Amino acid sequence: MSSTEEKFSLKEVLVSFKSCLVDDDQDIIVEQYLNGWKGLVRFMNSLGTIFSFVSKDAVTKIQIMENYLAGTNGERYRTLQSMVEHELSSDLVDLTKRCNNPDSGCRTILRLHRALRWLQLFLEKLRTSNEDSKTSTLCTEAYNDSLANFHPWIIRKTATVAFLALPTRNTFFEVMNVGTTEEVVAMLGESMPYVTKVYDFTHEIYSQHNLLELP
């Protein structure tokens, strides 16, 4: 069983994203970021194929980044800041078109970053919702406020139709393998600030270097 097929654990995701942040929250350890994402992939896969349009792409992006970490310049990819500095100084990032370096680390992390925003919004909505809330509505709202802005119409339409098949809030909480509803809500409350910090810091670094619209 691969690392993305194991049973989902919300606590492991919390630990990974908490461990991401170093140097007084001024940098991100890429390996821990990827570990957090592996946990999120397990979360999506545990719900069947509904989120496969995101999870499959995330698995591909994780593999690209792990190849960079294992490569000859792996140390340059250890943190987010060192990766950005290395790729920009080495002309590995094309800000105008994709053809030259389609799989740069900067572009790859950006795609994960955009998807993280959707999951961040959705999980926060789940945390603050009530038992009768429609998860399809919560997920669609989160999607429309994030990933939908980067998807063509056909994918947006397919995604929102797929969301209609989402299970109940209680089923989502059971998948998280934490315990009672109250315990899940409490752990989400502990986890989401770290996910938000990681997202916000990544967004800030990419904004500083004009990387948020990489093709």
From Swiss-Prot:
Gene3D superfamilies: Glycolipid transfer protein (1.10.3520.10). Keywords: Cell membrane, Cytoplasm, Endosome, Golgi apparatus, Lipid transport, Lipid-binding, Membrane, Nucleus, Transport. GO terms for biological process: ceramide 1-phosphate transport; negative regulation of autophagy; negative regulation of interleukin-1 beta production; negative regulation of NLRP3 inflammasome complex assembly. Pfam families: GLTP. An N-acylsphingoid base 1-phosphate binds at residues 57, 61, 107, 111, 151. Its main location: cytoplasm. It catalyses: N-(hexadecanoyl)-sphing-4-enine-1-phosphate(in) = N-(hexadecanoyl)-sphing-4-enine-1-phosphate(out); N-(9Z-octadecenoyl)-sphing-4-enine-1-phosphate(in) = N-(9Z-octadecenoyl)-sphing-4-enine-1-phosphate(out). The keyword Cell membrane applies. GO terms for molecular function: ceramide 1-phosphate binding; ceramide 1-phosphate transfer activity; phospholipid binding. GO terms for cellular component: cytosol; endosome membrane; Golgi apparatus; nuclear outer membrane; plasma membrane. It is found in: Cytoplasm, Cytosol; Golgi apparatus, trans-Golgi network membrane; Cell membrane; Endosome membrane. The keyword Nucleus applies. InterPro entries: GLTP_sf, Glycolipid_transfer_prot_dom. It is a peripheral membrane protein. It comes from the Eukaryota. Mediates the intracellular transfer of ceramide-1-phosphate (C1P) between organelle membranes and the cell membrane. Required for normal structure of the Golgi stacks. Can bind phosphoceramides with a variety of aliphatic chains, but has a preference for lipids with saturated C16:0 or monounsaturated C18:1 aliphatic chains, and is inefficient with phosphoceramides containing lignoceryl (C24:0). Plays a role in the regulation of the cellular levels of ceramide-1-phosphate, and thereby contributes to the regulation of phospholipase PLA2G4A activity and the release of arachidonic acid. Belongs to the GLTP family. This is Ceramide-1-phosphate transfer protein. It comes from Xenopus tropicalis (Western clawed frog).
